[in-house]
Regions:
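Conserved P-loop NTPase "ATPase switch" module shared by AAA+ and STAND
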Residues: 69-84
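Conserved catalytic/switch belt of AAA+ P-loop NTPases
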Residues: 85-103, 107-109, 116-117
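Interdomain hinge/linker elements that couple catalytic modules in large macromolecular machines
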Residues: 133-134, 138-316
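A cross-kingdom feature that marks ATP-driven nucleic-acid transaction machinery
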Residues: 1-9, 13-28, 32-45, 49, ...
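Catalytic P-loop NTPase motifs of RecA-like helicase/translocase cores
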Residues: 53-55, 80-82, 110-111
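Conserved AAA+ ATPase "SRH/arginine-finger" region at the nucleotide-binding site
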Residues: 124-135
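Short glycine-rich substrate-engagement loop in P-loop NTPases that contacts/grips substrate
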Residues: 44-72
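Short regulatory helix/loop adjacent to the ATP-binding pocket of P-loop NTPases
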Residues: 109-125, 139-142
Length: 407
C-alpha cells in the first residue's frame, strides 16, 4: 500500500523549475518509492547505483553512463558515484529541460557538498524524513507545527485524536514506510535487516575495516541514551572503544540520518547555559527495537517512557518543517543551576518554550523555567506543554496544553 507523502506537491513544483532535483534522506524513508509513484505513466527511466555494474560504469565512464541512461532519468543512490555530478552539470549548462535528472541518496551531508561544489545554482535539494504522524493519518495538506492558536485549531480539525496507549503504539511502530505500509509485517525482522543493510552498505564504505559487531553495539548503546545530553565517554565505555572512535562513529550516525542533535540555546545575556547537545534518533521504532521493548504497553511503563516521548515529539515537529521544505530552528535550554526547558522553537522573531511530559494532567509549575528566556535578546512568545492529554487546552493566554497527537 502506497502512503501519500506531503513532499510530493513541493517536489512536483520544484521539478518544473530545475533541470536537476536531488532528494536526500536516510535509508528506507521512501525516497525511491515516492519518485516511482510520481513517474508512473511517464517516459522516465530508473537506474540504481546499488547495482555494482551500473556503479562501476558511473564511476569509470560517467559520460557513457549518462548516454546509456538519457534524460529524463531517476538515478538512485547517487552518492556512490560522485563523478556523475560534473557531467550532469555539463548537461544542465547545455540546456537540459526542467525535470531531466532526479537524483536520490542516503548521505545528505556528502551529497549537499557535492551538489554545492558541482551543481551550485543548478539543482534543487529537498530532504525527506520518515513518515510523519499526519502522513500515517492520511493527512498531507497541513502546515508546519506552530503555537499560533488558529494553526493549532486547524491541526485539531484534520488530525486523528489518539489516546496515550495509541501514542505509544505510534512510537513503538516507528515511521519507516517498509514496515508501516504493511509490506514487511514482522517488525523485528524488518529492523534487524535495516541495521544489517546500513552497516554492510554504508558504514563499511565510510569506515573501512570497522568491526561490524561493535558498531551494532554502539548504535544500541546510543539508542539507550536517546533524548539525553550526549555523553560519548559513557557510550564508548559501554562498547569498549576509545572516545575518539566513539566520536567518529557518532558522526557517522549523524551523517547517515540515524541520529540528530539539539543544541542548547544561548546568547550573550544567558551566560550560565550548558554547552552539551542532546541526541535523538529520527525513528523511534528503531530505538524501541534496539532497546528491546517487545510491545507498546511495556514501553509505556518502561524506563525510557519519558525520553522516548520527548524523542517522538521533537522528531515529529522537525518532520512538519522538512515535509514543507522549510528550515526549523530548535534548541533546548539547560543552565548550571539545572533549570531546563525541553524545547525552544525560534520562529518569527520569538522564542517559544515547550515542555514535553508523559502525563495527562501535567503540573503547571513545570513552565516556571520559561521566564528565564525573558533575559534573552529575542522576545519570548507563546509557550506550551505537549503531553498525553487528548484535548487542546491552556494554562493561560500565553501557554497552551497541546496533545501529542496534534503535532
Amino acid at each position: 500500500m502506497y502512503i501519500e507523502r506531503q513532499l510530493e506537491k513541493k517536489f512536483i513544483a520544484i521539478n518544473e523549475e530545475y533541470a536537476c532535483v536531488l532528494l536526500t534522506g536516510p535509508r528506507q524513508v521512501g525516497k525511491s518509492t515516492m519518485l516511482r509513484h510520481l513517474m508512473e505513466g511517464t517516459a522516465r527511466a530508473e537506474v540504481s547505483l546499488d547495482d555494482l555494474e551500473e556503479r562501476r560504469l558511473a564511476k569509470t565512464d560517467p559520460a557513457m553512463f549518462l548516454k546509456l541512461h538519457p534524460a529524463p532519468v531517476l538515478i538512485d543512490e547517487v552518492q556512490y558515484a560522485p563523478e556523475l555530478f560534473s557531467y550532469i552539470k555539463i548537461a544542465v549548462d547545455n540546456g537540459a529541460a526542467p525535470g531531466s535528472y532526479w537524483l536520490t541518496g542516503s548521505q545528505a551531508y556528502r551529497l549537499m557538498e557535492l551538489a554545492q561544489e558541482s551543481l551550485a545554482g543548478r539543482t534543487a535539494i529537498l530532504h525527506m524524513s520518515a513518515l510523519s504522524q499526519s502522513e500515517l493519518c492520511g493527512v498531507v495538506d497541513v502546515s508546519p507545527f506552530s503555537l499560533e492558536l488558529d494553526e493549532l485549531q486547524k491541526r485539531k480539525a484534520v488530525l486523528s485524536p489518539a489516546t496515550p496507549n495509541e501514542i505509544y503504539q505510534r512510537i513503538w511502530g516507528g515511521a519507516l514506510p517498509g514496515h508501516r505500509s504493511g509490506k514487511y509485517k514482522d517488525r523485528d525482522v524488518f529492523y534487524s535487516s535495516y541495521i544489517q543493510t546500513y552497516i554492510d552498505r554504508d558504514v563499511t564504505t565510510d569506515i573501512p575495516g570497522v568491526d561490524k559487531v561493535m558498531f551494532a553495539d554502539f548504535i544500541r548503546a546510543a539508542a539507550c541514551r536517546s533524548g539525553q545530553m550526549l555523553n560519548l565517554h559513557d557510550i564508548a565505555g559501554d562498547v569498549g572503544v576509545s572516545d575518539d572512535t566513539a566520536k567518529r562513529w557518532m558522526k557517522e550516525l549523524e551523517k547517515s540520518g540515524i541520529v540528530f542533535f539539539l543544541h542548547p540555546y544561548s546568547n550573550n545575556l544567558l551566560k550560565r547555559t550548558i554547552k552539551t547537545p542532546k541526541m535523538y534518533f529520527f525513528d523511534t521504532g528503531l530505538v524501541c527495537y534496539l532497546t528491546r521493548y517487545s510491545s507498546p504497553e511495556i514501553l509505556m511503563n518502561g524506563a525510557i517512557n519519558g525520553a522516548i516521548l520527548e524523542n517522538y515529539v521533537v522528531s515529529e515537529i522537525i518532520k512538519t518543517y522538512s515535509n514543507s521544505a522549510q528550515d526549523c530552528l530548535l534548541h533546548y535550554y539547560r543552565d548550571k543551576n539545572s533549570n531546563e526547558i525541553d524545547l525552544i522553537m525560534e520562529s518569527d522573531g520569538q522564542l517559544h518554550p515547550i515542555e514535553i511530559k508523559k502525563s495527562i494532567n501535567p503540573p503547571t509549575q513545570i513552565t516556571g523555567a520559561f521566564k528565564l528566556l525573558d533575559k534573552a535578546s529575542v522576545p519570548r512568545g507563546t509557550g506550551a506543554i505537549i503531553c498525553l492529554r487528548e484535548a487542546l487546552s491552556a494554562i493561560d493566554s500565553g501557554t497552551y496544553i497541546v496533545p501529542a497527537w496534534m503535532i
